[in-house]
């Protein structure tokens, strides 16, 4: 069960870092207005 917990923590940390960098730097993809 410990492996599952460690994997969950690792994925959560990577997700938070990814979103932090994504929101910090504006996406270079041209926005069409919808999404």
Curated annotation (Swiss-Prot):
Stated membrane topology is: Single-pass membrane protein
Swiss-Prot/TrEMBL GO biological process terms: photosynthesis
Q: Name one Pfam family in it.
A: PsbT
Q: Could you list the residue ranges that cross the membrane?
A: 3-23
* InterPro entries in UniProt: PSII_PsbT, PSII_PsbT_sf
Record's subcellular location: Plastid, Chloroplast thylakoid membrane
UniProt keywords (A-Z) are:
Chloroplast, Membrane, Photosynthesis, Photosystem II, Plastid, Thylakoid, Transmembrane, Transmembrane helix
Alphabetical GO CC annotations of the entry are: chloroplast thylakoid membrane; photosystem II reaction center
SUPFAM superfamilies for this protein: Photosystem II reaction center protein T, PsbT
Q: Which domain of life is it from?
A: Eukaryota
Q: Which HAMAP family match?
A: PSII_PsbT
Give the protein family.
Answer: Belongs to the PsbT family.
Q: Which PANTHER family match?
A: PHOTOSYSTEM II REACTION CENTER PROTEIN T, PTHR36411
Q: What does this protein do?
A: Found at the monomer-monomer interface of the photosystem II (PS II) dimer, plays a role in assembly and dimerization of PSII. PSII is a light-driven water plastoquinone oxidoreductase, using light energy to abstract electrons from H(2)O, generating a proton gradient subsequently used for ATP formation.
User: Whom does it interact with, and what assembly results?
Assistant: PSII is composed of 1 copy each of membrane proteins PsbA, PsbB, PsbC, PsbD, PsbE, PsbF, PsbH, PsbI, PsbJ, PsbK, PsbL, PsbM, PsbT, PsbY, PsbZ, Psb30/Ycf12, at least 3 peripheral proteins of the oxygen-evolving complex and a large number of cofactors. It forms dimeric complexes.
Name this polypeptide is given: Photosystem II reaction center protein T
């Amino acid at each position: 069960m410990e492996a599952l917990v460690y994997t969950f923590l690792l994925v959560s940390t990577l997700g938070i870092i990814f979103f932090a960098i994504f929101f910090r730097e504006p996406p270079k993809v041209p926005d069409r207005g919808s999404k």
